[in-house]
Amino acid sequence: MGLFDEVVGAFLKGDAGKYQAILSWVEEQGGIQVLLEKLQSGGLGAILSTWLSNQQGNQSVSGEQLESALGTNAVSDLGQKLGVDTSTASSLLAEQLPKIIDALSPQGEVSPQANNDLLSAGMELLKGKLFR
């Protein structure tokens, strides 16, 4: 394996791999719109609105809040994808989901591309942040 392959492999085990796993998990939950609806109906509408807003600053959310809104089974599924326990998965989701939703909604709503193919849209966003 060459140096490039080693670097790419290490990178994919880091944040990019986490993003990809989260985006894949979101699609398994029914897509970004379904996830947004679950967050809204789970009592996180005010927090969610800051992630979708064009204003600076996403309101933070706890892993417990996300687990309550999305369901323990759903968060456990993410943990299995990531190879971590449910508590770690919910903490990671609390850290990354606001950033992902914010990035996928540059005009205050989720872009049509993200609705159609979340994984591709998310990886394009990630690529844009990495290779500026």
From Swiss-Prot:
<dbReference type="Pfam" id="PF20159">
    <property type="entry name" value="YidB"/>
</dbReference>
<dbReference type="InterPro" id="IPR045372">
    <property type="entry name" value="YidB"/>
</dbReference>
<dbReference type="InterPro" id="IPR027405">
    <property type="entry name" value="YidB-like"/>
</dbReference>
<protein>
    <recommendedName>
        <fullName>Uncharacterized protein YidB</fullName>
    </recommendedName>
</protein>
